[in-house]
Amino acid sequence: MFITLIFLSYINIVLSNNYWARLNETITLNSNITNDTNNELGIFWNSYNNTYYNNTFNNIAICGKKGIFCECNINYNTSISNTSISNTSIYNVTNNCSLTIFLYDDNIFKTYQLVYQNYKINYTINLLLPVTSPNITYNCTNSLITCEKNDGTNTNMFLSINNITINHTNQDILTYYWNNSEFNNFTATCMINNTLNSANTTKVINCTNPLLNSYQNYFLENIHTLFYIIIFIVSGLIASIFISIITFLSLRKRKKHVEEIESPPPESNEEEQCQHDDTTSIHEPSPREPLLPKPYSRYQYNTPIYYMRPSTQPLNPFPLPNPCPPPKPCPPPKPCPPPKPCPPPKPCPPPKPCPPPKPCPPPKPCSSPESYSPPKPLPSIPLLPNIPPLSTQNISLIHVDRII
């Protein structure tokens, strides 16, 4: 110790020591100072104060040592307010100038400093707490095991796989990547301990099919979400089928209605046939009647031609037309479908520019007027010699409507 102090004084470094202690425990900070009996040595015990950002050391005791004797003057209030331990002092100095501390409160766990001559030694006292069982997690996709500390101080953590220690640390978290090719189904144990107690956690890890395992975990964690998705899909399918059926029936009914409107009524053919029979019976002559020659075509003059028939020929009565059946009452009109909305008018294209007007050709000279010739007289048609005069005949006019 003496050699260490000489070395520290030479390089000007402060020596630091860490102590772990429980609550209500007494700890002694040993000074280990030796000096000659002829020389007196001054010793100072200080405590670190970090209240209100005032990082300074407060003096606890001032001691003088000569040989093996030590006499101190304690400047710190050593009384304890708790009645159960009121007779116990917080700080005491032994005969060799070592400091004894009773750790009755959390505020006592701090840093203390020993100063003598040109030497400084820091003693840091930490509160030692018991440990609890750690947490162990794993990720099959990354082949990762994680051990995490819950409570406890001054701890050591160990990881064992199949009762074989694989890794250890004194930090709060321990991680380890295992080899997939060696094992995927094993038992992992995380153990944590300190000088007070120890605890462990064991978990069976099965990663034979990491992809399937991850899908199973996702399914179990999101089972309620998948249930709502299935209900939504089934409801959508039922609604789509219902809408399709309604649309099909509506289109079928509309098509049938349009066909009934466009198809002609069955009575129209009979009426047209009846009218056609009447017309032919009136205008077409009987086949027994003799046909007289027609000198000119009907289309030439566009006028009806009448012929005379002698009274010696018997008149053939024309057959009367068949009476038409009474018309059937028309069915009530069916309501028309609502008109479709007209599409919006398309914008008119811009007008094309007119081409420039072409120059007019020069006027042609007028031809000389043709001479007028009088019309030729119509040829005289001789009458038949056997026809008596008009005054002695019973003449009837026949309207001939046949085209020669």
UniProtKB/Swiss-Prot annotation:
Keywords: Disulfide bond, Glycoprotein, Host Golgi apparatus, Host membrane, Late protein, Membrane, Receptor, Repeat, Signal, Transmembrane, Transmembrane helix, Virion. Residues 17-225 are extracellular. Disulfide bonds join 140-207, 147-190. Residues 247-404 are cytoplasmic. Sequence repeats lie at residues 322-327, 328-333, 334-339, 340-345, 346-351, 352-357, 358-363. Residues 357-388 have a biased composition (Pro residues). It comes from the Viruses. May play an immunosuppressive role by inhibiting lymphocyte proliferation and subsequently facilitating viral replication and generalization of infection. Responsible for viral hemadsorption, which may help viral spread. Increases virus replication in the tick vector at the step of virus uptake or replication in the tick gut. May play a role in the host Golgi reorganization to yield viral factories. May play a role in host cell penetration. Both glycosylated and nonglycosylated forms interact (via C-terminus) with the host AP-1 complex. This is CD2 homolog. It comes from African swine fever virus (isolate Tick/South Africa/Pretoriuskop Pr4/1996).
